Amino acid sequence: MSLSTEKKAAIVAEFGRDAKDTGSSEVQIALLTAQINHLQAHFAEHKKDHHGRRGLLRMVSRRRKLLDYLKRTDLALYQSTIARLGLRRLIFYYDSKKSSPRILRAFLWGCTR
């Protein structure tokens, strides 16, 4: 279940710094996002494809690591990339009373719970 060459080239042209830039973090994240979206449609129809689901989880984990790297190195590029891809972002903050990190969701999605 891979993307066609034309789709990959269009993603590289949109997110890359030039036409042959396939190694930058934002291009890799965009390619993984397209593959993940494609596989989610596949799993809506094939619910018992557990072997493929394992590969999907691996892709999601790899994208998360690339997003963490991009956030650490270039915050402005990270924010523009997730805005262009339509991804959610989680902001962790440390509560002064507890040592465990909490997720600040109300700021991001407007939800109150």
From Swiss-Prot:
<comment type="function">
    <text>One of the primary rRNA binding proteins, it binds directly to 16S rRNA where it helps nucleate assembly of the platform of the 30S subunit by binding and bridging several RNA helices of the 16S rRNA.</text>
</comment>
<keyword id="KW-0699">rRNA-binding</keyword>
<dbReference type="GO" id="GO:0022627">
    <property type="term" value="C:cytosolic small ribosomal subunit"/>
</dbReference>
<dbReference type="Pfam" id="PF00312">
    <property type="entry name" value="Ribosomal_S15"/>
</dbReference>
<dbReference type="InterPro" id="IPR005290">
    <property type="entry name" value="Ribosomal_uS15_bac-type"/>
</dbReference>
<comment type="subunit">
    <text>Part of the 30S ribosomal subunit. Forms a bridge to the 50S subunit in the 70S ribosome, contacting the 23S rRNA.</text>
</comment>
<protein>
    <recommendedName>
        <fullName>Small ribosomal subunit protein uS15</fullName>
    </recommendedName>
</protein>
<keyword id="KW-0694">RNA-binding</keyword>
<dbReference type="GO" id="GO:0003735">
    <property type="term" value="F:structural constituent of ribosome"/>
</dbReference>
<comment type="function">
    <text>Forms an intersubunit bridge (bridge B4) with the 23S rRNA of the 50S subunit in the ribosome.</text>
</comment>
<dbReference type="GO" id="GO:0006412">
    <property type="term" value="P:translation"/>
</dbReference>
<dbReference type="InterPro" id="IPR000589">
    <property type="entry name" value="Ribosomal_uS15"/>
</dbReference>
<keyword id="KW-0687">Ribonucleoprotein</keyword>
<comment type="similarity">
    <text>Belongs to the universal ribosomal protein uS15 family.</text>
</comment>
<dbReference type="InterPro" id="IPR009068">
    <property type="entry name" value="uS15_NS1_RNA-bd_sf"/>
</dbReference>
<keyword id="KW-0689">Ribosomal protein</keyword>
<dbReference type="GO" id="GO:0019843">
    <property type="term" value="F:rRNA binding"/>
</dbReference>
